[in-house]
């Protein structure tokens, strides 16, 4: 009997304002940020905003038609881009703030190690520190 995918670390998905969040903590933070935006303390609140860390890599190769004549150069993607998807991004006093909601932090886990690399790339590429909530 198929029961679907088990949530990681036992968290339960929560829906607020028709938006499904991965955890109660993330949904609660959304409600807090929404209140701050309504009060005018933050602006331009975005959910799941993507930041490109490493662009896609392409290989250029000459293309030939059936007659053997060279056509315009073609491009083939050999590596997809690497992106970081922030839980929340907003502006406070004109400065971009990026937040990632973390429940249980296990430094030994592969998922957290991947996050640490993306956090460092965000600082290097975009000059933005990620706040862990």
For the regions a language model picked out, list residue spans one by one:
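Electrostatic, structured charged patches in enzyme active sites and in nucleic-acid/phosphate-binding
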Residues: 1-133
């Amino acid at each position: 009997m198929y029961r679907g995918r088990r949530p990681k670390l036992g968290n339960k998905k929560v829906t607020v304002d028709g938006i499904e969040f991965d955890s109660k903590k993330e949904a609660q933070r959304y409600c807090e940020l929404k209140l701050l935006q309504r009060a005018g303390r933050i602006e331009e609140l975005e959910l799941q905003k993507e930041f490109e860390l490493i662009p896609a890599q392409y290989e250029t190769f000459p293309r030939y038609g059936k007659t053997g004549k060279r056509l315009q150069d073609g491009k083939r993607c050999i590596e997809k881009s690497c992106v970081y998807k922030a839980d929340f991004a907003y502006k406070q006093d004109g400065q971009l703030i990026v937040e990632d909601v973390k429940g249980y932090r296990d430094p030994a886990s592969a998922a957290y190690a991947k996050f640490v690399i993306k956090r460092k790339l965000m600082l290097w590429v975009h000059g933005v520190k990620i706040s862990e909530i």
